Amino acid sequence: MIRVGIVGFGTIGKRIADAVAAQGDMHVSGVLKVTPDYEVLVAAAKGFKVYTLPDRVEKFKKAGIEPAGTIEDLIKASDVIIDASPEDVGAENKEKYYSKFDKPVIFQGGEEAEVAEVSFNALANYDEARGRRYVRVVSCNTTGITRVLTSLMLNGVGIKKARIFIARRGADPKEYKKGPINDVVPNPATVPSHHGPDVKTVLKNVDIVTMAVAVPVTIMHMHMAFLELDGAYPRDAVLEALAKTPRIFLADVGAGFQSLAQIIEYARDLGRPRGDFPEVAIFRDSVTVNGNELYLMYGVHQESIVVPENVDAVRAVLGAMPKWESIKKTDTTLKLFTEGKRYG
């Protein structure tokens, strides 16, 4: 049983904790919180031991919460650490704590690529993470782009260049201090946005440029993609490649999927925890082939898309399971769509 310690229990961390707990070969050794708030109560109710930073122990005790120990205790009690801290905090934790221990650590996409030896996406480069000490699961948008490109390349559809235009959600649902509320903000105004270079940390040879704006929604990101392929492929061949790749979902307008909100409503109706949708949701009707040009639109659920990637990263760094076996196990335990998918 792999003991997984999770540093951070926010939007991503709490989802990773639940996902790890659902795996038959993993156990949540504990979670780390820096604030003694309601999320501590949630973690405790789920049976997770709660740790904190050394300088926060007394604050927890004053709030009537006895922590299981400090971050160093959590590291000692774990075979691998997943750091789901806010942006840049993971790098600080690496310097202060992780560097003292010979334990693998998995960071999130909010950290700079230099924090790790490998930037990770399960479909694209699972085996590159084997035996590594520091691995970084790329961000939600980068994960979405990488999955789409890899789904084509795994099925023999070559990509000469990719141009992706991103409408980013302004904030996560619980982030009441963020926006915009009534605006569209270049994010950034310069070209490329950071997503393209980030994709290249995984897919080294891809020719990609990205642009992004932030919009006043909280549900999902929307990507509009133009891909130049290495030849003229039938639309059916492209759709087949997408349909049989794990963690890709084809949404049909004729079935009622006319917006991203309906994708999330579908997840809720399915009874998925928190209404999460870890798959990339590609609008089938948008998939258009014109010679060697491919156009498509797809949604990325920023709160959950990286969760299965973190689970697979645990097995990858420890060499615990082959790539496709891990991906299939993760998808099955998290109840993602597996029918018609090819694992291998």
Curated annotation (Swiss-Prot):
Catalytic activity from the UniProt record: D-glyceraldehyde 3-phosphate + phosphate + NADP(+) = (2R)-3-phospho-glyceroyl phosphate + NADPH + H(+); D-glyceraldehyde 3-phosphate + phosphate + NAD(+) = (2R)-3-phospho-glyceroyl phosphate + NADH + H(+)
Keywords: Cytoplasm, Glycolysis, NAD, NADP, Oxidoreductase
Gene Ontology biological process: glycolytic process; lysine biosynthetic process via diaminopimelate
Domain of life from the UniProt record: Archaea
Pathway named in the protein's UniProt entry: Carbohydrate degradation; glycolysis; pyruvate from D-glyceraldehyde 3-phosphate: step 1/5
Record-listed D-glyceraldehyde 3-phosphate binding positions: S139, C140, N141, H195, G196
GO cellular component, one term: cytoplasm
EC number, as in UniProt: 1.2.1.59
One of the Pfam families matching this protein, by short name: DapB_N
Entries under PROSITE patterns matching the protein: GAPDH
Residues engaged in binding NAD(+): T11, I12, G110, R169, Q302
Protein location: Cytoplasm
Protein family according to the UniProt entry: Belongs to the glyceraldehyde-3-phosphate dehydrogenase family.
Oligomer and partners: Homotetramer.
Protein name: Glyceraldehyde-3-phosphate dehydrogenase
Natural source organism: Pyrobaculum arsenaticum (strain DSM 13514 / JCM 11321 / PZ6)
